[in-house]
Design a protein with these regions (language model features):
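Multi-pass membrane proteins that catalyze or facilitate reactions on polyprenyl-/lipid-phosphate substrates
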Residues: 2-22, 31-301
């Protein structure tokens, strides 16, 4: 596909959207990729980083390597994600701390609309897709109610966290950030981003690179050979994840971060008890943002 500067600028903006979603525990950058119409190309491009393409790189055929991995596309997306993560990490963590109901309400509407958006691409609901959907809902719901673990902070475990979290990040409905919460490393990694802890970030990114290049092959195969079933699972993931992004929560357990700030560790959903009108408005905004992004992506194709 021939693309111009305008196209790559748009791709970078889509990457910014993915990065913003990935910073929020409970929301997936993969969901945004699906909404803006780049999911399949993203998975296929990542999958193309393999032995064959790496051979081109190490034999000095860099132009052929870049073309083989759809490099212009990937660098645009990665640049957008990086800009978003490094610029929004402080803002998102502040909003989640000081205005949690508003943030979760917006993303609740966004994820709810995304569930419809992905689900409508399922061509047929049958004895294979319905169980796949139910399994997706159950797995995602279980993940959202799991208790965060106390884990080590050595570099090998940080590497594993990168490999595991990135797989979740490219799955619509499964939040890489929330996987980091369960692994006990969300605020640790956010702190590394804010302070630019280069060693921690490089080890985490190394794990992410290994994880995403491996998992993308599995996902690409599933989408090409079992698309309806795969989409049913992904739709289930998103519906099940709504439990995590419900705006009204009660804190059951807390922890103190490295700056002495008390933050929630385990939360339970409760009935709406504050900011109800504002939250409903933000849910509607999040819902229609997905609709707008879908229409915009369709017009720009």
């Amino acid at each position: 596909m021939e693309r111009g500067l305008k196209d790559y600028a748009l791709l970078m903006l889509k990457g910014v959207g993915m990065g913003a979603a990935d910073v929020v525990p409970g929301v997936s950058g993969g969901t945004i990729a699906f909404i803006v119409g780049i999911y399949d190309e993203l998975i296929d491009s990542i999958k193309s980083i393999n032995g064959k393409s790496l051979k081109l790189f190490f034999t000095g055929k860099w132009g052929a390597f870049w073309k083989a991995i759809n490099g212009n596309f990937l660098i645009s997306i990665v640049a957008g994600i990086a800009v978003s993560v490094f610029s929004l990490a402080k803002v998102i963590t502040w909003l989640l701390t000081d205005h949690p109901v508003m943030v979760w309400a917006f993303f609740f509407g966004l994820v709810l609309a995304s569930t419809w958006f992905v689900g409508k691409d399922i061509k047929e609901w049958n004895k294979k897709t319905i169980p796949a959907f139910i399994i997706g809902v159950a797995v995602a719901y279980y993940i959202t109610v799991a208790t965060p673990a106390e884990t080590p902070s050595n570099l090998f475990f940080i590497f594993l966290c990168g490999a595991i979290a990135i797989c979740a990040m490219i799955l619509p409905g499964i939040s890489g950030s929330f996987i980091l919460v369960l692994l006990g490393k969300y605020f640790y990694i956010m702190e590394a981003v804010k302070t630019f802890d280069i060693v921690t970030l490089l080890v985490f990114l190394a794990g992410a690179c290994i994880g995403i290049t491996t998992f993308s092959r599995v996902l690409s195969y599933a989408l090409k050979n079992f698309r309806n079933i795969t989409l049913a699972v992904l739709t289930g993931f998103m519906l099940g994840s709504l439990n995590k992004v419900w705006p009204w929560k009660e804190t059951l357990e807390t922890f103190t971060d490295s700056h002495g700030v008390v933050k929630p560790l385990v939360e339970a959903n409760i009935l709406p008890n504050q900011y109800i009108v504002e939250a409903v408005v933000l849910m509607i905004v999040g819902f229609f943002l997905v609709y707008f992004l879908e229409k915009l992506s369709t017009c720009l194709l």
